[in-house]
């Protein structure tokens, strides 16, 4: 059986801790590989080597660093299918969805080709008599990215691009559930010209995470995952003086107004709610139709669409709408929450319980579920399910609908479907959520805008990619310079204003 190790100093290396985790094929339920789990000693060695490599990389001309990003874009395009196939095999998502995973990461690397412009400083001449003042952006040094299972290409690339093009070295700790693609990305970075040691991929579990958080060398940590772990990482990183950017869970609401195109809204809900088996932090998991008539008509349109969804392995190609969830534990958790919805009184309109696929009975497949008449006190409303489950909460008015989204503890993404501009503008201005869609169900910003949630979906004041990506991985230094005229002067004892 294949054993996956780490990427250290420009090559794949075997783990030395003797500890491993199983890597499954979610479609079959079989263990297809084992991944090494790093010890603290392995991690510390990788960090020390990264710190040494960063010295020269940080001093490299920003345009030369940008050329590495440019070459990487070409290599990602060249190996798109290879990366997507490996991603689908370990994660379970369909092949087209896996290609989208790589593509959205690639787009951030494209944006990072413009790093020299983003890193330019500011200059003021004659700030005082014979005095010039300028500010510069400098890399932090060694930074870390701790990335999730659901986007094993996109999120590592979102972290790597701004960090590396800003002159940092990075310790990447990907999910141990689907570790192949991050290792492949590291190989492509080397082929693109990234010096050895500047990117270290260290596979591991909590021992590696805690080692990153406690390291005195690592200056910043970026994380994407669940809210409890995001809070843990944010608090522990901050306690050791690190800059932290931690993104957690979501419960994204889509409000459907009475004037909305309900066919369009139903199509949007099916794609946004069930794509990738619901394992997306930007998935729509709560539909909020306004008015009983709107709700009845929406359910009527949703049911046949959901019942037609095709669930199967990625090898079936275009014949499949979504694949399995990532682990047996994830499947069991979804089934538990679905049953809680039934027990607490929600109406299960489309019942995917007991779903089984011939030939793949041991796979981690979950049938599609649609709930109606869900109320805010139910677990399926409060909890991020991370599965193919859509909950419908009926609202009597627009104010009630927006109030539901505002009062929920998560604030990652949201959407409203309406033909009325005043309603859309009011919603966009009042909602306390980080990413908002107007007739767009999954409002993931493009690479040159920032991505980030509010409330318990995001911890830290700087977001991912866009301008915030460069701000997070750099710090400013301001220099005040004065060149003596040659006339000897006495010491100054007062803090004088510049005149």
Question: What are these model-predicted stretches?
Answer:
Residues 26, 40-43, 62, 80, ...:
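Residues at or immediately preceding the N-termini of alpha-helices
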Residues 29, 65, 87, 109, ...:
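Residue-level signal for inorganic ion chemistry
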Residues 77, 121-266, 319, 395, ...:
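Rossmann-like NAD(P) dinucleotide-binding subdomain of oxidoreductase/dehydrogenase enzymes
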Residues 32-38, 53-59, 145, 254-257, ...:
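Short, well-ordered beta-strand elements within core beta-sheets of diverse protein domains
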Residues 1-27:
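Hydrophobic face of amphipathic alpha-helices that form TPR/SEL1-like repeat modules
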Residues 228-375, 438, 487-489, 493-499:
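ALDH superfamily catalytic-core signature
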Residues 30-119, 130:
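Glycine-rich loop-to-alpha-helix module at the N-terminal edge of alpha/beta enzyme cores
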Residues 28-34, 218, 255, 310, ...:
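Conserved C-terminal structural/oligomerization subdomain of aldehyde/semialdehyde dehydrogenase
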């Amino acid at each position: 059986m294949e054993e996956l190790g780490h990427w250290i100093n420009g090559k794949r290396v075997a783990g030395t801790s003797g500890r491993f985790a199983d890597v499954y094929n979610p479609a079959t339920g079989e263990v297809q590989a084992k991944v090494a789990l790093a010890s603290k000693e392995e991690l510390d060695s990788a960090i020390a080597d990264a710190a040494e490599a960063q010295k020269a990389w940080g001093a490299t001309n920003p345009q030369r660093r940008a050329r590495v990003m440019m070459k990487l874009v070409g290599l990602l395009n060249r190996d798109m299918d290879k990366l997507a196939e490996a991603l689908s095999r370990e994660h379970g998502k369909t092949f087209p969805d896996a290609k989208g995973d790589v593509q959205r990461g690639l787009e951030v690397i494209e944006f990072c080709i413009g790093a020299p412009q983003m890193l330019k400083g500011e200059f003021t001449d004659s700030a005082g008599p014979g005095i010039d003042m300028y500010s510069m952006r400098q890399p932090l040094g060694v930074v870390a990215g701790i990335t999730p299972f659901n986007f094993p290409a996109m999120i590592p690339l979102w972290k790597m691009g701004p960090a590396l093009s800003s002159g940092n070295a990075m310790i990447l700790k990907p999910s141990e559930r689907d570790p192949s693609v991050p290792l492949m990305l590291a190989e492509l970075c080397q082929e693109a010209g990234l010096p050895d040691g500047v990117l270290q991929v260290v596979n591991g579990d909590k021992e590696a995470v805690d080692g990153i958080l406690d390291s005195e060398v690592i200056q910043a940590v970026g994380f994407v995952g669940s809210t409890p772990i995001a809070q843990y990482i944010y608090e522990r990183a901050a306690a050791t003086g690190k800059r932290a950017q931690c993104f957690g869970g979501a419960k994204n609401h889509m409000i459907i107004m009475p004037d909305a195109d309900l066919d369009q809204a139903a199509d949007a809900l099916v794609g946004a709610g069930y794509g990738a088996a619901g394992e997306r932090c930007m998935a729509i998991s709560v539909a909020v139709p306004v008015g009983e008539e709107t709700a009845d008509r929406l359910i009527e349109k949703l049911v046949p669409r959901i019942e037609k969804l095709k669930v199967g392995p990625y090898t079936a190609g275009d014949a499949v709408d979504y694949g399995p969830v990532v682990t047996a534990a994830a499947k069991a958790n979804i089934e538990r929450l679905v049953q809680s919805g039934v027990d607490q009184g929600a109406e299960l309109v489309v019942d995917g319980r007991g779903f089984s696929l011939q030939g793949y009975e041991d796979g981690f497949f979950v049938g599609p579920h649609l709930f109606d008449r869900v109320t805010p006190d139910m677990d399926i409303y409060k909890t991020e399910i991370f599965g193919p489950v859509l909950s419908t909460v009926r609202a009597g008015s627009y104010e009630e609908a927006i109030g539901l989204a505002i009062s929920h503890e998560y604030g990652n993404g949201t959407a409203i479907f309406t033909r009325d501009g005043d309603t859309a503008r009011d919603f966009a201005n009042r909602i306390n959520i980080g990413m908002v869609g107007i007739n767009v169900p999954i409002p993931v910003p493009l690479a040159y805008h920032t991505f980030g949630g509010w409330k318990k979906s995001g911890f830290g004041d700087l977001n991912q990619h866009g301008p915030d990506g460069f701000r997070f991985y750099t710090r400013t230094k301001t220099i005040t310079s004065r060149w003596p005229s040659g006339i000897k002067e006495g010491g100054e004892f007062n803090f004088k204003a510049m005149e």
